[in-house]
Amino acid sequence: MAQYEFQTEVSQLLTLIIHSLYSHKEIFLRELISNASDALDKLKYEALVDGTYKQLHCEARIDIAFEEDAQRLVVRDTGIGMNAEDLRANLGTIARSGTKAFLSTLTRDQKQDSNLIGQFGVGFYSAFMVASKVEVITKKAAENTVWKWTSEGQNAYTLDEVDAAAFPVLEGVAEGSAGTCVVLHLSQENSEFATRWRLEEVIKKYSDHIAFPIYLHYLQKEYDKDGAVTDTQKKVDQVNDAGALWKRPKSELKEEDYHRFYQTLTRDSTPPLLYVHTKAEGTQEYVTLFYVPAKAPFDLFHADYKPGVKLFVKRVFITDDEKELLPVYLRFVRGVIDSEDLPLNVSREILQQNRVLAAIKSASVKKLLGEFKRLAECDGKKYDEFITQYNRPLKEGLYSDYEHREQLLELVRFRTLSESVPEDGWTSFAEYVSRMKPDQKAIYYIAGNDDRVLRQSPHAESYRLQGFEVLVMSDDIDGIVMPSVSKYKEWELRAINRLGSEEELRPNEETDAAAQREQGFKPLLERLTHILSDSVKEVRLSKRLSDSVSCIVIDENDPTVQMERLMRATGQTHKSKIKPILEINASHTLVQKLKESTDEAFVEDLAFVLLDQALLIEGMDVGSSVDFVKRVNRLLARG
């Protein structure tokens, strides 16, 4: 008998599951049935693409049996099965980053955490919530060896080669069938899970729409008038519906049907925000059923995110790991695509080049974006919930999906400096346009990483004073995405921290006086440009500033701060740093002092301090924090 230690994360996981989710124990059966369904799907797919499996003939089914007196529960599938290597990889160690994420995501809310178990792919271990010992007897398809994995949920497990007789005999399951049998030795307090009524209740609740039949084996007893058992018969009943819900007409389905199927599909017990059920007929025949989860998937912004859409061909499962079924920015969508026109033996390479699938993808994107628009028009409160979760991915689409950019521009939302909108309220481009000043030529925005800082930005001072609304874009990708979006309908989009965006601003004085002032400041501007030449392109007077003394402006053709950081991180930028422009407020006391001073040391110190504080407000690095502090101290000492 070979004994192995669990990987550290498995031990932590077992402890957390057993002690954190005790009031939602029934979910263990949901997880075991879902795993069985996955195993059946995998075998079905392998039989299509791998000649090794094509000769195997076995009814795809899930069987559940129990022994009430012995407090034993059996969950058996005729799926792909496992060998010793699979058992060690899948049940002894946890190689996926999702499990570590699960451990860090536990909320102490038992209902929410019981939902997370399945989404993070660690559902098997929930069996230890109800069992003092778990045995896994399994035979991989196309192999002859039977293996037995055993653990009491502590720190170790055993793994042995066993005889085929180790599989429990179940009516309807062909002898010698591949697949996996999970045997749970229930603890005393969980004896309810060795009763027919409780098992039927849980299966109906969570697994009614599993695509394979689930059979419950039980003993039907007959009693006499005194309550004595007079006859016992073995019975096998199919408990679940086992239909492809997406194939049924929408007129036959209720909202609760869609919600139950969503739970089965995603193991998410929270109802989805919306679902979209489409049947296409004509040159191409396919059905799609898409869901938008109420909460964003945990791996939404992981590079190795798991796709949420399953592909079927004529109801035969093909893959749930294909990222090309929908655009990357719609990776939060869950659901199924079932095509009548794709070949059953379709490979991943064929999928990526297939015209049928490309057409389904394009139509699905249009349908989903149309549903999002309908939601925005019909239920603003619900759309706000949607945007709170998925605004950022939709913005990614503005950058990557030119074909649907116009639709996406109507869907994305932003915060705003408008006093008519609460600070935590959303506004659309269309709503912004409806509030624009007469003859206003552009839509103005400011982008950065901190909403609070952006709201106090010096760049917005004159815009606010002169009645120009400014959109606040504080997602980390806004500074990368928005420069690629030049227009919304006929209005240009202008970042107020970019040179040229100030064209519509009125100068603080008459034109002649402004020109005269500019001329009067010319020597100072040239002087400051020379002092700061290693750090800035130019120092100029500002039309944007009314109260603040200085601000940093990006030249018209230079990348934003966010884009420059991305370029630097990916090695795409030149060694020489891109220099910004420093704007100063001619009306500010400090600038007046600069103009009047003949003290070169004072002018140099104050010039660098004005630059550094403008950089700090932008969230940019100052050249040297030590030099900055020394300069501030020297200026303070002057009084």
Curated annotation (Swiss-Prot):
It holds the Pfam family HATPase_c_3. The keyword Ribonucleoprotein does not apply. It is found in: Cytoplasm. Disulfide bonds: none annotated. Residues 566-639 are annotated as: C. InterPro entries: HATPase_C_sf, Heat_shock_protein_90_CS, HSP90_C, Hsp90_fam, Hsp90_N, Ribosomal_Su5_D2-typ_SF. The keyword NADP does not apply. Keywords: ATP-binding, Chaperone, Cytoplasm, Nucleotide-binding, Stress response. Belongs to the heat shock protein 90 family. Molecular chaperone. Has ATPase activity. Homodimer. This is Chaperone protein HtpG. It comes from Treponema pallidum (strain Nichols).
